[in-house]
Design a protein with these regions (language model features):
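Short, Lys/Arg- and Gly-enriched loop/turn segments at beta-strand edges
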Residues: 42-50, 89-99, 237
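Short, surface-exposed secondary-structure boundary micro-motifs
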Residues: 39, 87-88, 230
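FNR/FR-type flavoprotein reductase catalytic core
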Residues: 68-216
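Structural signal for conserved beta-strand scaffold positions within catalytic alpha/beta enzyme cores
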Residues: 6, 51, 154-156, 209, ...
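Ferredoxin-reductase
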Residues: 1-80
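Local cysteine-cluster metal-coordination motifs and their immediate loop/turn environment
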Residues: 112, 190-191, 212-242, 270-275
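Short Fe-S-cluster ligation motifs
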Residues: 235-239, 243-280
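A generic structural signal for residues embedded in beta-strands
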Residues: 36, 84-85, 227
Length: 280
């Protein structure tokens, strides 16, 4: 069992938890993920490592409350324990030797982008960060990004905070201002990453994307997280989650991402009923 030592609501639908997991904290690197199961009879879900403290032996996870399992996870309180917490899994993001990078995060994807931006900053890399949200009330981790970014652009769809617009507009502006990046790292909704990659292609920039499809075992056995990358089948859990943005078949990934929505909706309703929570 893995004890919850801290729990914070970052916005109405996103929660941060700090979990006691010394062996994972000792080995975790930015870009890797954990397979989490809140209760013995819960489904397994992948959550990317959002931070770690090797001395304290803790690992941070940040998740959006969208389905049955995340509702169950969010029902746990400080002092209680998560049933399964397996990792670190996947390949760490390669950050060595980079001198100037733009990190682009969207929504809860910013939780994945943050430890990568931190690692780059600690290595002396110039980091420009662009984060996007639908509105001000969904904003997360602004101060944390400020602390590890040489420049930070905050975008909101409705203009309620930062600059009104999408993250690709900010990337266009940064390049127009004379910035040339060794790499653009983008993490967020599939449609956002698809258009960030297109923007990078327009400017001749290399990009990598973090793919977080449906995942069950996290070791490549089930095939649930398969993707087409460069015309070949890859598995996000063992070959990724980072891939060359130019090679990912985003349309296929988006189509696969909608396959289980009816089941997810039923699981969400069942979890809400079980925990006496209102379905929103």
């Amino acid at each position: 069992m893995y004890k919850i030592t801290e729990k914070v609501a970052l916005n109405p639908t996103v929660t941060k938890m700090v979990i006691e997991a010394p062996l994972i904290a000792k080995k975790a690197k930015p870009g890797q993920f954990i397979i989490v199961r809140p209760f013995e009879d819960s489904e397994r879900i992948p959550l990317t490592v959002a931070g770690y403290d090797r001395e304290k032996g803790t690992v941070d996870i940040i998740f959006q409350i969208v389905g049955g399992t995340t509702i169950e996870l969010n029902s746990l309180q400080v002092g209680e324990s998560v049933h399964d917490f397996v990792g670190p899994l996947g390949r760490a993001t390669e950050v060595e030797g980079l001198k100037k990078v733009c990190v682009v995060g969207g929504g809860v994807g910013c939780a994945i982008a943050l430890p990568i931006a931190r690692e780059l900053h600690e290595q002396g890399c110039v980091v420009h960060s662009v984060v996007g949200f639908r509105s001000k009330d969904l904003l997360i981790l602004e101060d944390e990004f400020k602390a590890c970014s040489d420049e930070l652009r905050v975008m909101t769809d409705d203009g309620s905070y930062g600059t009104k617009g999408v993250v690709t507009a900010a990337l266009d502006e940064l390049v127009a201002a004379g910035n040339q990046y060794d790499l653009v790292i983008t993490i967020g909704p599939l449609i956002m990453m698809k258009f960030v990659v297109k923007t990078c292609q327009k400017h001749g920039l290399k990009s990598i994307v973090s793919m977080n499809p449906i995942m069950i075992d996290g070791t490549g056995m089930c095939g649930g997280c398969r993707l087409t990358v460069g015309g070949q089948t890859k598995f996000a859990c063992v070959d990724g989650p980072d891939f060359d943005g130019d090679l990912v078949d985003f349309d296929e990934a988006m189509a696969r991402g909608t396959m289980y929505r009816p089941f997810e909706a039923r699981a969400r309703e069942a979890a809400c009923n079980l925990l006496n929570q209102e379905v929103k």
